[in-house]
Amino acid sequence: MKTNIIPTDGMVITEDTTFAPGTYALPNGITIGADGVTVAGEGVLIVSPQQVGVGVAAQGRRGVTVRGLSLNGFYHGLRFDDCEGVTVQNVNVRGTQEIEGIDTFLYLWLPIEKTYGGAILLNNVRGGTLLNCDLQHQMNGVLLYNTSGVTMEKCNASFNSGWGVYLSNANENTIQDNQLDFCNRVYRRPEDGSIRVEADAAAIVLVKGSSRNRFLRNSCLCGGDGVFVAGYEHPGVVTPCNDNLFEENDCRLSPNNAIESTFSRGNIFRRNDCSRSNYGFWMGFSWDNVLEENIVEFNRWVGIAVEHGHNFTIRNNRIRLNGEGVRLWTRSAVGEGVMPYWPGYEVAYDFTLENNLFETNHTGFMGYTGEKITDRECRAFHLRGNTFRDNRVGASFSRVQDSTLSDNQFVSNVEAAVRLVGKPGVTVGANTFEANAADVAEI
């Protein structure tokens, strides 16, 4: 091992190396040029003045480790391509390339050749660990392209103007125990000049079929979205992000959606806090999803919103103090927007809601077919074993068929426990009604 080495601009490292503490201007960075190499640098800061190039790069290497370095001012702080078994530990990255601000809406589907700047980029990497890294105050924290088997743990990628963690065609990775707070972006809408926090910034983003990943115990507070899963690029590019697990993440305080997961199948959302946002969950055009044991409170519009979705299980959630607790509905007309690319998704159907608490919402449950769909209706909404307490309306149905209410408790709902608009096809079975203004109101 080489120790106390003064790094030089563009140097290639082929054996274990520890740099001497200090600040070094290396606009061409350094390259790891052999397998099994460790580069260490406690007290070392490597800088570039122009936000171009890469601070530490490796291509086609195995078993490389970077530990303890600080980097500032590159396009990417660290970049690994076509590698296996990469470890990045206790690294600090700041000041990587960032696009212009208020008038730029982010594009979620950039190819690797045009990727945004960021602290760490892994492309076509198999296996690795990102541990205890500080990746705050730039555009993006970690970018994973075509990468699998990587664990990102105990990193801080907060206060970024794009994404904390971004996955594009990235599968079977684990993202756990990270701080990914305040990843948001101010955007001026060109049509009217209004300014909002949006532009598809988020703590966690999945695109291009990123599947079978695990997201555990991450803090995603105050993101543009907390989590954004986007399985479709308009027009006609269908790449669902399937079979991911989101468990015990804190996604509160988004001005948009605590969790948005669209056009994707088989995702599980368990014990997340999706509160104090415009929407807790936005789940359009998704299917075969499970939402269980989540906290969904104080959302401005809707706690759980699913348009044009099907085959959901929504169980054991605490759904309180929202505008609407759960909304299942249709919005688009046949032939409009994305509908030509999603045949069979004209209505919402096959939902099971069981053992949830709906409390102090304006409307606990809302199921309806929108006015733009005229030749068919939503169907098979089955609500059983739920408690509806102190809502203005417990459960409301309009233009819905083959649906059931059974074994639910309706207590102290202010206007009605159940509201049926226009004689929908809803069977009200054996439920418990207590102290409601009306038990079943037909309008």
Label for each model-derived stretch:
Residues 359-360, 366-430:
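Ankyrin-repeat and related helical/solenoid repeat scaffolds used for protein-protein interactions
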Residues 47-57, 77, 89-123, 128-132, ...:
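Acidic/polar low-complexity surface segments
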Residues 10, 16, 23, 29, ...:
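Detector for repetitive beta-architecture
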Residues 1-31, 67, 89, 94-112, ...:
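Extracellular "leader-to-stem" segments immediately downstream of a signal peptide or signal-anchor
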